[in-house]
């Protein structure tokens, strides 16, 4: 049993704000939160280990709810191309983009992919992240999608972090199905998806519904199969063009629709009606030098929960810093500090279907982060620094500096 004292706790349990408790005490027992409240209300725990928070800020452990963490290769050359004027879409149409990463990832061994992914995951953890969603989508066939998802599962075996896996086989058309997207969709729904689901490798299913990806009709076939397998769905939607993907996802009760720069009010309303979370990805917006912002005001108006994630990937968001995304979301998308912190805690948990994480509440997992700052707004305000002091995974404390969670 642990007793964390002398802290301000941002519980994230109210509707819009931080749910802040000044001079709080949190009691952890058997990996879960047994008590959270004002210090003067806390029960006696004479045998507990007492941890002095030194007046710091305690938040839920951060949740990165959209990453592509398992890949090989580099896309630095495409970064240079874009600086010379090429667009993300032009590069993709010339065989670059996702397809170049597919080639490198297929050629890499599972051991090589695990080594790369461990380093990326540890970087996120060192900044306060306790849950990471990891997508496939750089294999695009049964063998290599399995390889990616297996590596994602191995991250959770070698590190204390909570991993949620998402099958993103419908990410791009692989070379063996060139000019035959419909044929590849059939391969996904007849073989890849049911096989990997039956192997227990899939927590959710995603697709890239876009002019350079898959059509709404093709995407819907994937959704129907996922629903038949009782798997939750997510969607890359409305990043480059409006394909009405967000509405389609919402109609299938998707956990989330992600990117959303081109989202319209019809899609927002559908998301609100079906409880679909809007996952905003300011790192991709920044890196691609986009100018069309997601409709944050419409999302607010209709009460759609907004989450924030890194979209960590080699092509459009080579970023492994979730706290930086708070600052970018505030600066680029005009989100408030409260919205930003909610976006990487309670709303990010909703985007993954996690109902016992993302808040500091009795009965929930003790995934917690202690920061040296006193004001919760500082986590959004400052960037380029790391105020994390201690991280708890299921009630086990880890000091950031010593990083005793390291698998290597």
UniProtKB/Swiss-Prot annotation:
Domain of life: Bacteria
UniProt cross-references to InterPro entries, sorted A to Z: Amidohydro-rel, HutI, Metal-dep_hydrolase_composite, Metal_Hydrolase
Record's keyword annotation contains Acetylation: no
This protein's record includes keyword Zinc: yes
Cofactor: Zn(2+); Fe(3+)
Subcellular compartments: Cytoplasm
Keywords: Cytoplasm, Histidine metabolism, Hydrolase, Iron, Metal-binding, Zinc
Binding annotation for Zn(2+): 66, 68, 236, 311
Record: residues binding Fe(3+): 66, 68, 236, 311
Xref: SUPFAM superfamilies: Composite domain of metallo-dependent hydrolases, Metallo-dependent hydrolases
Pathway membership: Amino-acid degradation; L-histidine degradation into L-glutamate; N-formimidoyl-L-glutamate from L-histidine: step 3/3
Alphabetized CDD domains for the sequence: Imidazolone-5PH
Annotated 4-imidazolone-5-propanoate binding sites: 75, 138, 171, 239, 316
An example Gene Ontology molecular-function term: zinc ion binding
Gene3D superfamilies: Metal-dependent hydrolases, Urease, subunit C, domain 1
Positions of N-formimidoyl-L-glutamate binding: 138, 313, 315
Major place of residence: cytoplasm
A biological process term (GO) from this entry: L-histidine catabolic process to glutamate and formate
Known catalytic reactions: 4-imidazolone-5-propanoate + H2O = N-formimidoyl-L-glutamate
Cofactor: record remark: Binds 1 zinc or iron ion per subunit.
UniProt xrefs under PANTHER family: IMIDAZOLONEPROPIONASE, IMIDAZOLONEPROPIONASE-RELATED
Function: Catalyzes the hydrolytic cleavage of the carbon-nitrogen bond in imidazolone-5-propanoate to yield N-formimidoyl-L-glutamate. It is the third step in the universal histidine degradation pathway.
Family, per entry: Belongs to the metallo-dependent hydrolases superfamily. HutI family.
Name of this protein: Imidazolonepropionase
Organism: Idiomarina loihiensis (strain ATCC BAA-735 / DSM 15497 / L2-TR)
Lineage of the organism: Bacteria, Pseudomonadati, Pseudomonadota, Gammaproteobacteria, Alteromonadales
Gene name per UniProt: hutI
């Amino acid at each position: 049993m642990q007793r964390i004292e002398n802290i301000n706790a941002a519980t994230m349990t109210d509707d819009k704000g931080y749910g802040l408790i000044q001079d709080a005490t949190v009691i952890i027992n058997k990996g879960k939160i047994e008590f959270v409240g004002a210090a003067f209300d806390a029960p006696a725990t004479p045998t507990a280990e007492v941890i002095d928070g030194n007046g710091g800020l305690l938040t839920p452990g951060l949740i990165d709810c959209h990453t592509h963490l398992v890949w090989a290769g580099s896309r630095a050359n495409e970064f240079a191309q874009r600086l010379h004027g090429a667009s993300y879409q032009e590069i993709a149409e010339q065989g670059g983009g996702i397809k170049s990463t597919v080639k490198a990832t297929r050629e890499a061994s599972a051991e090589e992919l695990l080594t790369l992914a461990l380093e990326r995951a540890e970087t996120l953890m060192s900044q306060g992240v306790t849950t990471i969603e990891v997508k496939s989508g750089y294999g695009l066939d049964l063998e290599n999608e399995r390889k990616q998802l297996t590596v994602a599962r191995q991250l959770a075996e070698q590190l204390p972090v909570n991993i949620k896996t998402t099958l993103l086989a419908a990410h791009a058309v692989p070379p063996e199905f060139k000019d035959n997207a419909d044929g590849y969709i059939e391969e996904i729904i007849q073989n890849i998806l049911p096989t990997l689901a039956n192997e227990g490798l899939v927590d959710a299913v995603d697709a890239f519904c876009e002019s350079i990806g898959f059509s709404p009709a093709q995407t819907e076939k994937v959704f129907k199969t996922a629903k038949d397998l009782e798997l939750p769905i997510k969607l890359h939607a409305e990043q480059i063009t409006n394909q009405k993907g967000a509405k389609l996802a919402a109609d299938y009760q998707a956990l989330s629709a992600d990117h959303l720069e081109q989202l319209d009010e019809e899609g927002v309303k559908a998301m609100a009606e079906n409880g679909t979370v809007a996952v905003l990805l300011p790192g991709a917006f920044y890196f691609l030098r986009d100018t069309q912002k997601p409709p944050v005001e419409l999302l607010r108006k209709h009460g759609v929960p907004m989450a924030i994630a890194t979209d960590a990937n080699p092509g459009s968001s080579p970023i492994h810093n979730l706290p930086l995304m708070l600052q970018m979301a505030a600066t680029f998308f005009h989100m408030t500090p409260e919205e930003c912190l909610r976006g990487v805690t309670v709303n990010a948990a909703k985007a993954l279907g996690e109902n016992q994480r993302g808040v500091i509440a009795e009965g929930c997992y003790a995934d917690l982060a202690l920061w040296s700052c006193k004001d919760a707004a500082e986590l959004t305000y400052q960037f380029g620094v790391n105020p994390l002091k201690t991280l708890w995974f299921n009630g086990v404390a880890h000091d950031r500096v010593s990083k005793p969670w390291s698998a290597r």
